[in-house]
Structures are given as C-alpha cells and as structure tokens.
Swiss-Prot record:
UniProt-annotated location(s): Cell inner membrane
UniProt function note: Regulatory subunit of a potassium efflux system that confers protection against electrophiles. Required for full activity of KefC. Shows redox enzymatic activity, but this enzymatic activity is not required for activation of KefC.
Organism: Salmonella dublin (strain CT_02021853)
SUPFAM superfamilies assigned to the protein according to its UniProt record, in alphabetical order: Flavoproteins (SSF52218)
Record Pfam families: Flavodoxin_2
Protein name: Glutathione-regulated potassium-efflux system ancillary protein KefF
Name of the encoding gene: kefF
Main location: membrane
Length: 176
C-alpha cells in the first residue's frame, strides 16, 4: 500500500498539490492522510499514524517547500510519530525496509535550486534523507514540481500525471 502523508497548511490555495493528490487517488491501494485536515489543532493521534505507517510499503511525504523545509505540522508529525523504540533505536524496527518518496512542490523554478546562489535539492533533502535512513527506510529519488505559482493548468496536469506514473512504476516493480 502507498501511504501519502500530505502536509499543506493552505490546501485550497494549491492547485499543484490538489492535482497530484487527484492523480495519486486514481491508483489502487493508495491512502492519503491530510495532516492539516486531520489535525487542525496540531494534536496528532500518534497511534493512528503509526498504524497507517505499519500498513504501508511506500510512504510519501508530500508538501510544499516552505523556507527550504517542511511545513510545521509535518515536522511535528515526524517528532511525535517517529518515536524511539518504534521507528528507531532499540526495538525500533517498524519502518525497516519500507520505501520513502519525498514529493515536494515549489514556487521557484528548477534552476533556483541548483548549487550556486541557492542550495540544491541534494542539500535540501539531506535532513529528510537522514531521518529516513535513521528509521531504516529506503530513500527514493525525490519527485519535485517547480514553478507551481506560475504554471498553467495544462503544465500542472502534465506534471501531476508524471507523479502518478512515478507511483505506478513503483507499484509495478514492487508488487508485480
């Protein structure tokens, strides 16, 4: 099962993420957990989140990039859900061997994230990749949609279809 942990503080403003979720939702065995919908008060049900993670083979962290990082509720989710003794540390093997895909949208163009005057995606992904590896997850190359503020609907739809194809390809390779 693919579990999408979706974290967008203003989901009604994001056409890109909406289209990504719509495309992913057409696939079989996909569960979408919208953190800002489930936990508007930031009071995370850790047991429910861990149960959802235990059912997944592929975990997707989908969100808009905010200040070169994750939205606050996703960071809190990581702090609360990925606990010692469950996700890491002595006895913390619940996530070992599962795959993790970082699916991120940005307002800036792809060239904005090349090494030079701005940090590149290899640098920006390091904290998430380190978290994944520490929890025994298999890190997959990230999926990113850029220029989402200025893209027309056709471009956004095409990129959202690429996201769906990425998930479908993972399903085909990992579950026949």
């Amino acid at each position: 099962m693919i579990l999408i942990i979706y974290a967008h503080p203003y989901p009604h403003h994001s056409h890109a993420n909406k289209q990504m979720l719509e495309q992913a939702g057409t696939l079989e065995n996909v569960e979408i957990r919208s953190l800002y919908h489930l936990y508007p008060d930031f009071n995370i049900d850790v047991a429910a989140e861990q149960e959802a993670l235990s059912r997944a083979s592929l975990i997707v962290w989908q969100h808009p990039m905010q200040w070169y990082s994750v939205p606050p509720l996703l960071k809190l989710w990581m702090d609360k859900v990925l606990t010692h003794g469950w996700a890491y540390g002595h006895g913390g093997t619940a996530l070992h061997g599962k795959h993790l895909l970082w699916a991120v949208t940005t307002g800036g163009g792809e060239n904005h994230f090349t090494i030079g005057s701005h940090p590149g995606f290899d640098v920006l992904s390091q904290p998430l990749q380190a978290t994944a590896l520490y929890c025994g997850l298999k890190w997959l190359p990230p999926f990113s949609m850029h220029c989402t503020f200025i893209c027309d609907d056709d471009t956004l739809q095409a990129q959202a279809r690429q996201y769906k194809q990425r998930l479908l390809a993972w399903q085909e390779v990992n579950h026949g």
